[in-house]
Regions:
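Domain-length accessory/inserted modules outside core catalytic folds
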Residues: 2-128
Length: 128
């Protein structure tokens, strides 16, 4: 029996996003984010942002990306497509769109009671 795979846009702290293909199993998806998964849907496109369920609260996870006022993500996360009942491959055009949006890694500095985001522009361009 052929194993099913899923291709996602992987986003790690201090790295550019990249496409990654893994087995389409709960265990493989959990391994990519380092724990139990949770999905959020911050955009109108048919994609999910999948992260560690506890990632926002674990102090030992590095800050990764600022998505919007409600989504400061810690640790690894990935973006995948949405199928009828499950996650699916991220479509190529959406992989390009979100690779461009999240291309620059970010650093976070605590300032007063909040966080300041510094984008790490190395001059490279998305290749997804």
């Amino acid at each position: 029996m052929e194993k099913k795979t899923i291709t996602v846009l992987m986003v790690e702290p201090h790295r550019h996003p990249y496409l990654k293909t893994v087995e389409h199993t709960l265990e493989s998806l959990q391994a990519m984010v380092g724990g139990y998964i949770t999905a959020t849907y911050p955009w109108e496109d048919p994609v999910a942002l999948v992260a560690d369920d506890d990632g926002l609260y674990k102090q030992d996870y590095e800050w990764n990306r600022y998505i919007d006022d409600y989504h400061f993500i810690r640790g690894n996360f990935f973006i995948c497509g949405l199928g009828r009942e499950d996650f699916c491959d991220i479509p190529a055009e959406l992989a390009r769109k979100y690779a461009e949006m999240l291309w620059m890694p970010e650093s976070f500095i605590k300032v007063g009671g909040g966080l300041m985001v510094i984008r790490e522009d190395d001059g490279s361009k998305p290749y997804v």
